[in-house]
Amino acid sequence: MAAVVPVTVELGFVEEAPAWRLRSEQFPSKVGGRPAWLALAELPGPGALACARCGRPLAFLLQVYAPLPGRDEAFHRSLFLFCCREPLCCAGLRVFRNQLPRKNAFYSYEPPSETGASDTECVCLQLKSGAHLCRVCGCLAPMTCSRCKQAHYCSKEHQTLDWQLGHKQACTQSDHLDHMVPDHNFLFPEFEIVTETEDEIGPEVVEMEDYSEVIGSMEGVPEEELDSMAKHESKEDHIFQKFKSKIALEPEQILRYGRGIKPIWISGENIPQEKDIPDCSCGAKRIFEFQVMPQLLNHLKADRLGTSVDWGILAVFTCAESCSLGIGYTEEFVWKQDVTETP
């Protein structure tokens, strides 16, 4: 009988990085800032990147570079996750997949240079394809300032925001607009996501250590009380303890990647069943690919806008076939699980 080959889990951590490492031509995995789009054409439009609840533009949360070995059409492959920054709408989540063959219209056939360019370069507001990007969020921008004809936006909301934060004064200085992009307090802080393989031995060892500590703390407790405690231990407690033991060795992990594995849940409530995960538009089933951990919230500084972006787990499910539908961006599925409040 052939040995079962375990599927490795890659853990993601945030790390400061020079700006050049987070640009499209470096194929980054990253948090925050503007999206480093993969295909530089056929980007998702404003309608696809609007909150289904409030209609406001979604903010770019993170992207994961996840090529599929042995799949020529997915030699380059990235997943882009967006969320709503409004306090009542942080369930407004959307995720998109994009993939390209090694030989494509946008990037060199050879690997990118490891030497960085100057980090003083201006914000990229127009792609090589000619598509304009929003000055506020870096997404596709079909709207244009009617006065200067040089500033582009994804929505009326972002045009108004930019006008209030300086474009009103800079509008007549169109030659310098690329160098005059203010901080709109809309983007999340930008970090590179670096990965390492999870040590499969760790969680069991930690769990046994935790168990020993618990046993030690229960010395002298009457047997009747122990029986009562055991009866009241809920499935919820068990799942949360399993979650804690799983991440104990690497508590700073903000992402877990493992295509086709099972996610780890933080709560016994709101765990999706197979019927809850819609099939891909191509007809194939979707499988789990990665999850965003609550630890990422510590790095987002979401409170600076007075908002309350929050989650327990964000689990991303993608087409099992990773179907190729041209160079466009295919929407996938994200499941949000909140942290259950204990009484």
UniProtKB/Swiss-Prot annotation:
SUPFAM superfamilies: HIT/MYND zinc finger-like. It is found in: Nucleus. It comes from the Eukaryota. Ubiquitinated by PRKN, promoting proteasomal degradation. GO terms for biological process: apoptotic process; positive regulation of apoptotic process; positive regulation of hematopoietic stem cell proliferation; programmed cell death; regulation of hematopoietic progenitor cell differentiation. Signal peptide: none annotated. GO terms for molecular function: DNA binding; enzyme binding; zinc ion binding. One of its GO terms (cellular component) is cytoplasm. Zn(2+) 2 binds at residues 145, 148, 167, 171. PROSITE patterns: ZF_MYND_1, ZF_MYND_2. Keywords: Apoptosis, DNA-binding, Metal-binding, Nucleus, Ubl conjugation, Zinc, Zinc-finger. May be a DNA-binding protein with a regulatory function. May play an important role in cell death and/or in regulation of cell proliferation. This is Programmed cell death protein 2. It comes from Rattus norvegicus. The gene is Pdcd2.
